[in-house]
Amino acid sequence: LERSPFRRRFRLGSQEAAYLREKGMAAVLAHARNFVDRRLAPAQPEKDGKQTPWRGHPVFIAQHATATCCRSCLEKWQGIARGHDLDEAERQHIVAAIGRWLESQRNRGLARRPPPARTVREPFLPGLCPADTQSDDGGTGPRPLA
């Protein structure tokens, strides 16, 4: 999988990464198990090959990155044959693969430095001194130039 250019290009977007941080790994993996049970476990899943959205949840992106998104990918990349209901060991294998990928993304995000803080410039107002924010009456508004 790591040699596949298609699979390597997947990364968590900012919304999915925030969701993972907010909900936590345990909750997201519980979602993964639910998705696997409903969308992949049946012998003939509904809309097989199209049942996993491309974005919107960290698990969806992880499924595409780990080739656990449909039964044909499971067969080709994970060696799990089509045509039978997934057993407990196969389901656990899929969720574990998703978890490893999510953990690698979480660690990748921690290793990167946050971008520098953006400075916000005050708009130029003719006749006002932007450096002097103390007004004559003791307020905090800009004072007109004399």
Model segments located where?
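Iron-sulfur (Fe-S) cluster-binding segments and ferredoxin-like electron-carrier domains
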Residues: S72-Q92
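Immediate flanking context of iron-sulfur cluster ligation sites
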Residues: K47-A67
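Core of compact, soluble alpha-helical bundle domains
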Residues: L1-V36
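Short flanking/linker segments adjacent to small metal-binding domains or redox-active Cys/His motifs
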Residues: R106-A131, D137-A146
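Long, highly charged low-complexity segments enriched in Glu/Asp and Lys/Arg with interspersed Ser/Thr
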Residues: A89-P116
